[in-house]
From Swiss-Prot:
GO terms for biological process: maturation of SSU-rRNA from tricistronic rRNA transcript (SSU-rRNA, 5.8S rRNA, LSU-rRNA). The gene is RRP36. This is rRNA biogenesis protein RRP36. It is found in: Nucleus, Nucleolus. InterPro entries: RRP36. Residues 32-59 have a biased composition (Acidic residues). It comes from Ajellomyces capsulatus (strain G186AR / H82 / ATCC MYA-2454 / RMSCC 2432). Its main location: nucleus. Associates with 90S and pre-40S pre-ribosomal particles. Residues 108-119 have a biased composition (Polar residues). The keyword Signal does not apply.
């Protein structure tokens, strides 16, 4: 307040002739200085606080100061010191009860934000921390992953248990496609027709092939008949466009049927090679020459089939087969040649 600022001023009192007690200047001045210095800091803080809060009352205070100043000049220094001490005690009591709470609220409002903002800041800090940790983890050197290889080519494939499952799901099952099932060649029907014999039921396909082996004879007869038709059309004197189309169709039919017959014969030869090999292995095990049987691979079976076919061929057939083989190899080599050298030879 302005009054307190005026009271804090150090004024030397004039000597008066009244009946007041005479004080020594040194004792009074020392006491006043001690009390003034002790209360100076608190009074200045309170005055600054009130000056910032009560800006509107300053104008009125100035008018009061102008009225009070002439009356203060007549007051003795001892009375001023006593008044200052009394005012200081009263102000301490009032500030302890009234001024502390607004100060605390202001300080807390400045230092600590509102709960909503503080929670948002904490959430942002946690989120930033987690992102920083993820960044560090991604930049960190990953340990070299061990390649999982199979112990052998016959072993099952190895897959990690952490392998991600496919996100694709079959919501609607596709419609079942009708598959032809001929009861004459069905394994279930053939197993019942073998009267429950497990050895014959396991080889149902073999028995079906043996039961319907006459179809292959029909196929050979049909191929011979088609070849006769082609030769008759080719020797025809007046051929039409329809005859030409018929010759092309018959030749295509003969090629497909002959390929089917050769595939059937090749499978039969492979089956015979496997049967003979198993028979030999069983005999060797029975004689004690071997402890475990040896199973042929597909490439070995194929080589034995080719060797068997060459032994069964006649001289002309062998020459024809060797010529086809030579042309096939020469064509592959020609494709690998540069384009400029292909016509030289």
């Amino acid at each position: 307040m302005p009054i307190s600022s005026t009271l804090n001023q150090r004024v030397r009192a004039r000597l008066e002739n009244d009946g007041f007690e005479h004080f020594s200047d040194e004792s009074v001045s020392n006491e006043a200085l001690d009390e003034g210095e002790s209360n100076e800091d608190t009074e200045q803080d309170n005055s600054d606080q009130r000056e910032t809060d009560d800006d509107d009352t300053e104008d009125d205070g100035h008018t009061e100061i102008s009225d009070i100043n002439p009356s203060l000049n007549t007051i003795s220094f001892g009375a001023l010191a006593k008044a200052q001490a009394a005012l200081g005690k009263r102000k301490r009591r009032t500030t302890s009860t009234t001024d502390i709470t607004p100060k605390r609220t202001k300080v807390l409002s400045r230092q600590s934000p509102t709960p909503s903002t503080s929670s948002n800041k904490e959430h942002d800090q946690c989120q930033g921390l987690s992102e920083f940790q993820k960044h560090l983890a991604s930049n960190a050197k990953k340990p070299p992953q061990k390649l999982t290889h199979r112990t052998s080519k016959h072993a099952p494939t190895i897959q990690s248990s952490r392998h991600a499952v496919s996100r694709k799901r079959t919501i609607l099952e596709p419609l079942a496609v009708p598959k032809p099932r001929d009861p004459r060649f069905d394994s279930v029907v053939l197993s019942h027709s073998t009267n429950g014999d497990p050895s014959t039921a396991a080889n149902a396909d073999i028995h079906a092939r043996n039961n319907y082996a006459f179809l292959n004879h029909y196929r050979t007869d049909e191929i011979a008949e088609l070849r006769k038709q082609v030769s008759a059309l080719q020797t025809k004197k007046k051929k039409t466009e329809r005859d030409d189309h018929e010759i092309v169709r018959l030749k295509r039919e003969i090629t497909s049927m002959s390929d089917r017959q050769r595939a059937f014969e090749r499978k039969e030869m492979e089956r015979e090679v496997l049967v003979q090999h198993r028979r030999r292995e069983k005999e060797l095990i029975r004689e004690g020459k071997k402890s475990q049987p040896y199973f042929l691979k597909k490439g070995e079976v194929k080589r034995e089939v080719i060797a068997k076919r060459f032994t069964e061929m006649s001289g002309k057939e062998k020459q024809r087969a060797l010529e086809r083989r030579r042309k096939k190899v020469a064509g592959k080599e020609r494709k690998e040649m540069p384009w400029g050298r292909r016509g030289v030879e």
